[in-house]
C-alpha cells in the first residue's frame, strides 16, 4: 500500500467515527482485524468490532467523536505510525487528548490498530519518577 492509499484508509477510518458511519468503519477493516484501545481492551473481527462501534455510540455511553485530527503520519507499505488529537463526549462528559496509533495493513485494509493515549504531565512524572527529588 502506498502512502496515499494508507492515508486515505486512515482518513476513512477516523471519519467513520466522527460521522457515526458503521458501514464505512467496517469497510476499512480486514475480516479478522484487531483493535486494541488505549486502556488495553481489544476487539477482533468484523462482528465484534461492529458491535463495539455501535455500543460506543449508543446509550448509556452515548459516545460522539467531536474531532480526530491527524498531526503526523509515517508509513511504509505494511504499517503506519500516526500521532493525533482526539476529542469526544462520553457519558455526557467532554474529553480531549493527544495520542498515537500503530496500524498494520493487509490487502488494502486495516489488519490491526494499537492505540496509545498520552498521559497528563503530572501522571507522567509519577510513573517515570521524574520530579520526585
Tell me what each language-model feature is:
Residues 1-31, 124-133:
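Short, low-complexity N-terminal intrinsically disordered segments enriched in polar/charged residues
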Residues 3-4, 22-26, 30-76:
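A solvent-exposed, acidic/Ser-Thr-rich amphipathic alpha-helical stretch
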Residues 29, 86-88, 101, 117:
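Short beta-strand segments enriched in hydrophobic/aromatic residues
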Residues 34, 54, 83-89:
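Generic short beta-strand segments
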Residues 61-62, 88-96:
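Short, cysteine-centered beta-strand-loop-beta hairpins and adjacent loop/turn segments enriched
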Residues 67-74, 86, 98-104:
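Hydrophobic/aromatic beta-strand elements that line small-molecule binding cavities or substrate pockets
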Residues 77-79, 107:
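Residue-level signal for tight coil/turn positions that link beta-strands
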Residues 98-130:
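Short beta-strand edge/turn micro-motifs at domain boundaries
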Amino acid at each position: 500500500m502506498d502512502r496515499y492509499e494508507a492515508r486515505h484508509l486512515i482518513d476513512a477510518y477516523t471519519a467513520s467515527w466522527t460521522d457515526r458511519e458503521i458501514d464505512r468503519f467496517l469497510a476499512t477493516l480486514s475480516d479478522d482485524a484487531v483493535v486494541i484501545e488505549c486502556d488495553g481492551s481489544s476487539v477482533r473481527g468484523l462482528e465484534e468490532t461492529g458491535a463495539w462501534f455501535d455500543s460506543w455510540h449508543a446509550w448509556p455511553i452515548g459516545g460522539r467523536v467531536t474531532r480526530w485530527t491527524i498531526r503526523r503520519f509515517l508509513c511504509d507499505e505494511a504499517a503506519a505510525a500516526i500521532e493525533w488529537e482526539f476529542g469526544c463526549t462520553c457519558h455526557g462528559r467532554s474529553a480531549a487528548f493527544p495520542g498515537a496509533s500503530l496500524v498494520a495493513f493487509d490487502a488494502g485494509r486495516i489488519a490491526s490498530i494499537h492505540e496509545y493515549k498520552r498521559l497528563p504531565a503530572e501522571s507522567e512524572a509519577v510513573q517515570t519518577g521524574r520530579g520526585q527529588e
